[in-house]
Amino acid sequence: MKKNELVAIACLLCFCCCNETEKEVPNPDLQEELSPIQFTIDLQKEVLPFPVTKSIPELNIPEPIPQNPDAEEDPSTPDIDPDNLYNRIDYIVYQSGKPDILVKHKQFTPQDPDFTIIYDSLPSGDYHICFLAHSDKNISVSGQTALFSKVSDTFHLFLTQEVQTGERIIKDITLQRIVGKIEFISADAVSKALKSFTINVSNYQNKIDLTTGNGISQNTPYTQTDTFNDSDIGKTNFSHSFFTFIPAPEFMLKAHLSAKNQINEVTREREVNDILPLINHIIRYTGILYTPKESDDTFTLDILNDGKWDSPIDKDLKD
């Protein structure tokens, strides 16, 4: 299927230091030999288009069904730009145990030499290592959980690694996308009177279990407001979107949508319930977002898959 994957090749090389953000617990045995390791992060893609499915009642979102592999791909879907997927790499090392003990936490940015290449050295032992690629400047790691100030496109891997003194380690590892994207597309045009569009989300998923990459529900609210300018007047198909980690099925999201005019009067409100994000997919809603309601209309739900955020699954919803 369509996937964006981050591929890291770990091999034995000379140890180099980067000017990254680093938290490290000193090793009490300073005489123990260290084994230098290098992780190089890259991007890979696979493609699987999805069919159009219509007239699904209410907001019941089914699992996507793979399309005939001979079907044509949506030509409007742009290629992925790897430079825009992430600008932070977190490298978190735990000494394996019951419980695991945090050994070090390093964060790399594009300002570091050889960004996407992680140099490290570890003494012999058993380790759990977590990799996160994302764009949040304010990530907070506590134990084996991570809290994000705002969820961005995020890729993850948690692996078990044995390190032996003098051992040569060459290993391919793959980071998987662990977020879904919720997107609202306007079917109506931006009017001169329109000022802003706000999304209020209940049960926003901005915390994860680092061992699995799964979202941890904690009833967090999230608000996002997009403001229009003069160049937007008359345009349609505006996208308003946010990323989220994947909750357990019993913790679905709810979104309240509201458009306001220049004097801060609400011109349109919509409530979207029971949103269950899908990992590596866009859940796309298309409908009237700004214009005052005059009659009943429908809200079309699209689901797009992964890296290139590909072809939609359409669903009709009643107000």
For each predicted feature, which ranges?
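Acidic, serine/threonine- and glycine-rich low-complexity intrinsically disordered segments
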Residues: 144-235
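C-terminal motif of bacterial Sec signal peptides marking the signal peptidase cleavage site
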Residues: 14-17
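Intrinsic-disorder/low-complexity, polar/charged segments enriched in Ser/Thr/Lys/Arg/Asp/Glu/Gln
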Residues: 36-38, 114-116, 168-170, 181, ...
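Beta-strand secondary-structure signal
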Residues: 36-40, 90, 128-130, 170-172, ...
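Tryptophan-paired
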Residues: 71-140, 195-281, 311-319
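Acidic/polar, low-complexity intrinsically disordered N-terminal segments immediately downstream
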Residues: 21-110, 115-117, 126, 281-319
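Sec-dependent signal peptide recognition
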Residues: 2-9
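Extracellular beta-sheet/turn segments enriched in Thr/Pro/Gly and aliphatic residues
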Residues: 149-178, 185-187, 270-319
